[in-house]
Amino acid sequence: MPSLLLLTLPSFFGLALAQGVGNWLREVHPKLQWSSCAAEGDCQKIDAEIVGDANWRWLHNDNGYLDCYSYNDWVHGTCNSTEDCTAKCVYDGIDYKNALGIQTANDSVSLKLQTRFDFSYSVGSRTFLMENRTMYKTFTLLNNELAFDVDLSTVECGINSALYFVAMDADGGVSRYPGNTAGAEYGVGYCDASCPRSARFIGGKV
């Protein structure tokens, strides 16, 4: 299975597989350039974009503003069963700079550990490189060389700041799970071997 590029700061929440899309905030992916080079050194700049992981998105009731998930638990006043929460809860767009502290400039991306906004704050973030608006970028690792410059000068001891590859569905699971209309465009489908117990959705269901 192809691997996907992720840029990661520590997560204190868990993976998520969002099913639907809300309409409170339009999703606008930050732009990011990267270069693809031939063996002879001829490089071509690729105008791409990144997307924030669904786990850092507002999960709320469809056509409403009631939280579905808060303080690492489901809000039973909003939904009260696996079927109910799966059907009712949707993810919204991200204010990347002001809510998550994610900024891009040409071929660089900056992530903040903590970002304060509107009487609250966010901790950590995770982003994925995109092929286009609705598909993650996949890489063939065999017989290819990949290079990154990573600035860790402001990362303090004990903070997990990582850049790595992970196997995922390129479309974020849209083709595998009929109820999943958010997909890669909304950062859905992260998966790794650690099996976080705080997962909100697994296999398209709560």
Where are these regions (language model features)?
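Fungal secretory targeting signals
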Residues: M1-G20
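A long-range scaffold signal marking pre-active-site subdomains of enzyme folds
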Residues: L15-V206
